């Protein structure tokens, strides 16, 4: 057998190297300090939550959205607002009498007053009617008007389509606008171009609100007559 060596116990002192982490080598550099977080390094702020109806208002007159978000003011109730509330209470009863074939659909399930929200889009809204089929969803927006369907209505309907896809997982290729006084249906194709325009408008609205810069008024002065914010547009009246 070889020579038996005795173990050196002298290094096991309280606080010595054997009792914890090894001692740093002579001349070793200290760990680099963690740099402070600069303002530009912080994660971006979440997008401003908006409502679908804001898109229609922004296309109608961008100042409406500005007054609601960047400079909240007390608005005056107009005849259009009060009349619109009364009509909404009757629409569901009228719609239940309609047949799905009037939308060009053979089958489907109808849901009224569907609340939709998307955290990814930072968007929410209440859809008047959603028709769900095996092919996907068909959003329906009710309008109490005999006038033509304007482009801002297309944008609003497209926003509902984006919400149906994002929150319910139902693909949408077509939506409908039901004009109650005329009892007719306007078909709106949810095209890639309309989708891009809708998303771009949401981005422009948020930039306006963050900048707190009042936009110009609508060039169509007839729209100002029944506006609930007309008293605040000193450069128009």
Region annotations inferred by a language model:
Residues 1-137:
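Metal-dependent nuclease catalytic cores that hydrolyze phosphodiester bonds in DNA/RNA
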Residues 31-38, 192-221:
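Short, charged low-complexity linear segments at domain edges
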Residues 55, 61-65, 213-237:
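Cysteine-cluster motifs in flexible loop/terminal segments that predominantly coordinate metals
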Residues 57-60, 68-69, 89, 196, ...:
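Charged/polar, solvent-exposed surface patches and flexible loops
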Residues 68-77, 166-171, 235-237:
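Short helix-capping/linker segments at secondary-structure and domain boundaries
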Residues 85-89, 94-100, 118, 187-195, ...:
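Short, charged low-complexity intrinsically disordered segments located at boundaries
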Residues 86, 112-117, 143-145, 206-222:
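Hydrophobic transmembrane alpha-helix bundles
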Residues 118-209, 231:
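Nucleic-acid nuclease catalytic cores
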């Amino acid at each position: 057998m070889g020579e038996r060596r005795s173990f050196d116990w002298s290094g096991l002192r309280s606080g010595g190297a054997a009792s914890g982490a090894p001692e740093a080598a002579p001349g070793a550099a200290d760990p680099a300090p963690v740099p402070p977080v600069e303002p530009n390094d912080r994660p971006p702020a979440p997008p401003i939550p908006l409502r679908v109806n804001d898109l229609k208002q922004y296309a109608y007159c961008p100042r409406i959205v500005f007054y609601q978000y960047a400079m909240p003011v007390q608005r005056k109730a107009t005849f259009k607002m009060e009349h619109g509330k009364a009509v909404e209470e009757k629409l569901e009863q009228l719609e239940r009498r309609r047949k799905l074939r009037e939308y060009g659909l053979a089958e489907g399930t109808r849901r009224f007053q569907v609340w939709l929200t998307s955290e990814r889009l930072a968007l929410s809204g209440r859809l008047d009617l959603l028709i769900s089929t095996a092919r996907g969803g068909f959003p329906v927006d009710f309008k109490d008007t005999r006038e033509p369907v304007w482009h801002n209505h297309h944008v609003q309907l497209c926003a509902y389509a984006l919400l149906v896809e994002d929150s319910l997982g139902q693909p949408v290729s077509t939506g409908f606008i039901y004009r109650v006084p005329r009892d007719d249906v306007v078909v709106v194709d949810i095209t890639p171009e309309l989708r891009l325009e809708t998303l771009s408008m949401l981005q422009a609205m948020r930039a306006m609100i963050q900048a707190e810069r009042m936009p110009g008024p609508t060039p169509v002065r007839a729209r100002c007559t029944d506006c609930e914010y007309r008293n605040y547009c000193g450069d128009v009246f």
